[in-house]
Amino acid sequence: AGLRPWQASKFYFRAGFPFGFRGRSGPPPGALTINLAHYDALLGRTYAEIGSHARSMHKCQGMSPLIILPGTATASYRLMETTISDQSEQDEVSLFDGIDTSIEGLERFAGATPPDALRAGLIEVAEHAREALSKFQRDGADGVRESVVSGLGVVRNLRSRLSSLGLTEDAAWEIDHRLAAKEDQFERAVILAHGIRLEALADDGV
């Protein structure tokens, strides 16, 4: 129970100023630059707009309430330390370069020879997630209902079987901790895809 030891794989410092402020003509040399002007169709805004809107809510420190206008916006970061071999020598395009964030990648916690049943279960969970995303992009929320319900069942089944796969206590905890987050994501996707909304009302109507 409680928190377990962990170590960050990368440590970055911000390089330059956010949103391209102060007239910088280009990204700092040797820095990773992220495009903040990407439009998110689900959110209806760019990430720069979302960030500047949150920043405008400051009620102290003399912050400006101005919202960034549509257009080019970037943020740059410099990798200062990393536990990933030779990563500091790479020209990065993402903060996650060199880090396996896939569902299938969770098998690494099981050591050099993870159980076949674990590998198969993780692949199945990942396939349902990818299928749901593909159907959503093609058909919208109505098209993902079967995939997210099936995916929820698969991740719940895998979590229930972890203790029988011969994993060490630490390996089982690390994998289950992350699958619990994936289960929560599937649950929220099921609720959204089916348009479920619950409201709790008191007997007195208040």
Please name every model-derived segment:
Residues 1-195:
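Metal-dependent de-N-acetylase/amidase catalytic core
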Residues 196-200:
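Proline-enriched interdomain boundary motifs that mark the N-terminal boundary
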Residues 201-205:
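Short beta-strand segments of immunoglobulin-like
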